[in-house]
Amino acid sequence: MSSSELKIEAKERLVGKKKEAAIVILLVMVVTSVLGKLCGAFTINSTALDGLNSGSSVVVSTESQTPMQMLGRIIFFVVNTFLSLGMTSYFLKISRGEDAKIEELWSKGKLLPKALAVGIISGVVVALGYLALIIPGIILTIAYSMTSYLLIDNPDMGILDILKNSRTMMKGNKWAYFCLGISFIGWLLLLLPTIGLLSFWLFPYIDVTFCAFYNNLIGKGGVENAVEAETVEGE
C-alpha cells in the first residue's frame, strides 16, 4: 500500500474514536511531563548536594552522573517504555478495527521486562550507528521500528528473535517507511502555530498510520509469512 492509502485507512479507522484517542495522548503527555519534571528535580537536588559537599556554590558536571541522576533517568525510561507499549497496543487495535479502550495503556505490564530489554539492545545498536554517521543511525532506527508491534502480537517471542524479525521484515521496506515518516513533516510544522493543540489529532493519526504500515507488512499470513517473504526476496 502507498503512503496515501495507509493514511486514508488510518483516517477511516479513527472515525468515532478521535476523542478517546486524544485523551490517550493527553494522559501520556501529562504523565511523561510530570515525571520529566520530577526526574529533573532529582538532577537539580543531586547537583546542589554536590555543590555543598565540595564547598562551592555551583557545581556542574557532564562527565559523571550521581546515583540520584541515574535513578531519575532509569525511572523515566521504565515508565516511558511502559506507556509507549500500552499506547502502541491501543492504536494497533484501532488500526485493526478492534475495540480499543483507554485501559489498554496499562494492560501490557507483563511485557515490560522484555520491552525494556529490546529497547536497551536496539538503543545501543542505533546509538553506535549514529556515532559512525547519521545515515547508518537512521537506517538502524528504521530496521528496529517493528519491535514494539512484534512484541505485542507475539508476547512469547524471544528478545533476539524480535530484533531479528524486525530487521528482516524491514528489508526492502526501509525507504517506504522513511517516506511515510517524511510525509508528516508538513503537519508536524503546524504544531508550533497551534501551540501543540494539533497534537491531540495528529499523533493518533500518525500512530494509526504506522500501525497500518505494520499490518500491511504482516498481511493475513502473520509475522512468520512476512519474515519468510522478506528473506526470500533478499536472497
Model feature map: region roles:
Residues M1-E235:
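Hydrophobic alpha-helical membrane segments
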